[in-house]
Amino acid sequence: MAKTNSINNAAYDQLNKDADRILQLIKVQMDNLTLPQCPLYEEVLDTQMFGLQKEVDFAANLGLIDIEMGKEIMLRLEKELSKLHEAFTNV
């Protein structure tokens, strides 16, 4: 049972790290490369979000995380990206 909890925690931690990596990637891109309206920016964001959603679905299907935990990860990232986008466009 302890090993299962350890694996579940590791899966949840990894998904959070991946979400943070996406957020950091977008921060760097917004600071240095392109505007949020740029098709390249949108393509990178869409691709990264799609990939993370697939990771979440995979972990949930294997029973490594609860689907609600996965939804929370995605919602947190979407909220952070929205704040970042607002801050960048209101400058």
From Swiss-Prot:
<comment type="similarity">
    <text>Belongs to the UPF0358 family.</text>
</comment>
<protein>
    <recommendedName>
        <fullName>UPF0358 protein Sca_0738</fullName>
    </recommendedName>
</protein>
<dbReference type="InterPro" id="IPR036270">
    <property type="entry name" value="UPF0358_sf"/>
</dbReference>
<dbReference type="InterPro" id="IPR009983">
    <property type="entry name" value="UPF0358"/>
</dbReference>
<dbReference type="Pfam" id="PF07408">
    <property type="entry name" value="DUF1507"/>
</dbReference>
